Amino acid sequence: MHCLPVLVILLLLIASTPSVDARPKTKDDVPLASFHGADNANRILRTLWNLRGCCEDKTCCFIG
């Protein structure tokens, strides 16, 4: 019970702080997710299907 007021105060302080980027964005900045998101998702799904042994006869494989 002694920690509850401290926790509430910390949460209020964290919520009221302004968000500041460590490095200002330039016009050339592009999020990395746009480069790697689809490739990583396809690779992970393909690996999971291959682990199940499902893609050998292509009857239940939804990728490629």
Swiss-Prot record:
Protein name: Conotoxin Ts-011
Places the protein is found: Secreted
Organism lineage string: Eukaryota, Metazoa, Spiralia, Lophotrochozoa, Mollusca
Propeptide, chain numbering: 23-51
Residues making up the signal peptide according to the UniProt record: 1-22
Recorded GO CC terms: extracellular region
Pfam families: Chi-conotoxin
Protein family: Belongs to the conotoxin T superfamily.
Post-translational modifications: Contains 2 disulfide bonds that can be either 'C1-C3, C2-C4' or 'C1-C4, C2-C3', since these disulfide connectivities have been observed for conotoxins with cysteine framework V (for examples, see AC P0DQQ7 and AC P81755).
Modified residues (Isoleucine amide): I63
Tissues/organs with expression: Expressed by the venom duct.
Gene Ontology MF annotations: toxin activity
